[in-house]
Amino acid sequence: MDSFKTVLKFFTDQKTTIGYSVMAILTIGSERIFSMVSFQCPCTKGQNFPYGICFLLGPAVVLLVVGFFVSTRFWRLYTGCCLNPLKLCPRGNFVGCLKGLIKVLYGACVAPVMWLTVALLNGTFYECAVSGLDEVAVIQIFCADKGSVCQDELHRVPCGKSTLPPEQNTELLYMLRAQSQILGWSVIITAVVIALIGTCYKNCVSQVSYLQLTFWKIYMEKEREKFDAFANDYATKLADRNLKSFFDNKLPEEFPFPNHKAWEEISAIYNFRKSEQHYSTLQRYVERSDRDYSPDEHPMVEMDHGIEMV
């Protein structure tokens, strides 16, 4: 039993790493399925480029949209801002607003970057797309010293149907694949450098120590778990009370429940202040004596570490 708890705790502590690993495996598997089952390069000048680009960038765009859909931070920032724009940028705090949006974009870009990396390292989509370009620069790169036949047959190289000698066809295919893999590694290096710089900057400007930040993360995780449990329990009780009142044809019993303003406040992105020993908007709300509070009174300063409750 203790061993099971140890394993469970390990997976819980490493759930972010495990999540990214699973995402990477799914991305690689999806790319291989696309390449072997769905992708068939037309090998015509007019269709190679749009066809290859659609398979290269199309899934990345879809994954980006899905990333926004599943982003809790995005919906916390966006929900209700059309009716009340101050929710997004209270008191014109565009810096805090921009920080929040950048973090949303950062999280949403993980899956698309993984897809682009895997697709470029494989090279199939890139080979098809670039071979269909009728640009002088492309022709000069691939068909230098190979004559006009290479220019006319380049779009057929990915399919192996060109009239070029086999060794030239293989050489062109290797050149296309090498370019694709260079771009793939460039994407990886760029993403890693940006992630490193962002992490270093985030920790450098942190207003809390490392140990307090560790405690903060644990607290937010526990608060999130307890919130889900309490929400489920109270929703069940409220449903039971309403149904009992309906079927008994009696007035419902009094049921204490947070008002709209309370929900608005605890749903806001937390603003850290050194003068307050609070770790979430929920804690700040329950410990404040005066609860007639509007989130617009305080500018939104996005937490540097992006810890959030729900």
UniProtKB/Swiss-Prot annotation:
GO terms for biological process, alphabetical: ATP export
Species the sequence originates in: Danio rerio (Zebrafish)
Signal sequence, renumbered to the chain: none
Spans through the membrane: 17-37, 49-69, 101-121, 181-201
Protein name: Calcium homeostasis modulator protein 5
Subcellular location: Membrane
GO cellular-component term (any): plasma membrane
Entry keyword set: Ion channel, Ion transport, Membrane, Transmembrane, Transmembrane helix, Transport
InterPro entries the UniProt entry points to: CALHM
Family: Belongs to the CALHM family.
Gene Ontology molecular function: any one: monoatomic cation channel activity
Topology of this chain in the membrane: Multi-pass membrane protein
Role according to the record: Pore-forming subunit of a voltage-gated ion channel.
